[in-house]
């Protein structure tokens, strides 16, 4: 009887252990099928440019006042060759990447998922959002990524980051959306998606996918005190990129509207002229409306 009880106890223990193992496995999803489907739309980008001591390129071309916020693409040699990432958005060869990846580039080479290489031409850049559009002309059948809706993502959602960290193309990492609408003081349009997916030097310009396999962000920066991933990465929302890319595709540049406004203190004369009794507030005068950048 004692031996029988002992056997039952052991079997019960094994069953409970096996059950908990199955539950643990079910709690961590496999991204293998999704990664296999998405990787062909991601490309590696290599650029060549002559060193220019007066020109700020690479990681210094678009930086935050916070020294721990890094724009992160990998440079080799004497700033002559740089590596980054990008992703195909159309069957005719348009590719989105970061402006700082191709800034000052004299040659842009794209390596596809089949390891074939193509020479790319620059279509347009928008330094204010750190976005760029390039194009390759190839007879190969390309697999474009699907652009999603970054407004629909929620903090805690799973995401995949695919890119070319340290020249290791096709690297896939997973994480969650850690926060939205982050301002890292990198530019006038800061509205970053924060993630803990591991992204490193060379990943700049690569896509961030949701679990539907749609692009919801463009990986652009990391917070790091070491130069490597510390689990705090930032991506440009794809909804912003859609508008910028459309302008770059059609015009080669982004034209923005702006308003000239003059503000002056209120006074008795001003208050009387507009029929007010109080002297509180300020007077706002609309002077100019333009549909291009102010000079």
Tell me what each language-model feature is.
Residues 287-295:
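Residue-level detector of conserved catalytic or cofactor/ligand-binding positions
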Residues 1-10:
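Bacterial N-terminal signal peptides that target proteins for export
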Residues 24-288:
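Serine-dependent protease modules
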């Amino acid at each position: 009887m004692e031996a029988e009880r002992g056997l039952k106890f052991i079997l019960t223990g094994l069953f409970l252990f096996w059950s908990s193992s199955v539950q643990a496995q079910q709690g961590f999803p496999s991204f293998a099928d999704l990664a296999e489907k998405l990787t062909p739309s991601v490309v590696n980008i290599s650029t060549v440019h002559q060193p220019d001591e007066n020109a700020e390129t690479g990681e210094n071309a678009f930086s935050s006042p916070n020294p721990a916020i890094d724009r992160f693409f990998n440079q080799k040699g004497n700033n002559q060759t740089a590596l980054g990432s990008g992703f195909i958005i159309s069957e005719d060869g348009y590719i989105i990447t970061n402006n700082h990846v191709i800034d000052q580039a004299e040659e842009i080479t794209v390596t596809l998922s089949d390891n074939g290489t193509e020479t790319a031409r620059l279509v347009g850049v928008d330094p204010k959002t750190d976005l760029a559009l390039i194009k390759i002309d190839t007879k190969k059948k390309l697999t474009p990524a699907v652009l999603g809706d970054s407004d629909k993502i929620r903090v805690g959602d799973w995401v995949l980051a695919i890119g070319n960290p340290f020249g290791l193309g096709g690297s896939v990492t997973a994480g969650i959306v850690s926060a939205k609408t982050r301002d890292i003081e990198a530019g006038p349009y800061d509205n970053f998606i924060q993630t803990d997916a591991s992204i490193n030097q060379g990943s700049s310009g690569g896509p961030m996918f949701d679990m539907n396999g749609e692009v919801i962000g463009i990986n652009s920066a990391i917070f790091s005190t070491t130069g490597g991933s510390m689990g705090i990465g930032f991506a440009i929302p794809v909804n912003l990129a859609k508008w910028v890319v459309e302008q770059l595709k059609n015009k080669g540049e982004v034209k923005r509207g702006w308003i000239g406004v003059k503000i002056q203190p209120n006074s008795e004369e001003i208050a009387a002229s507009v029929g007010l009794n109080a002297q509180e507030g300020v007077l706002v005068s609309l002077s100019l409306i333009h549909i291009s950048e102010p000079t």
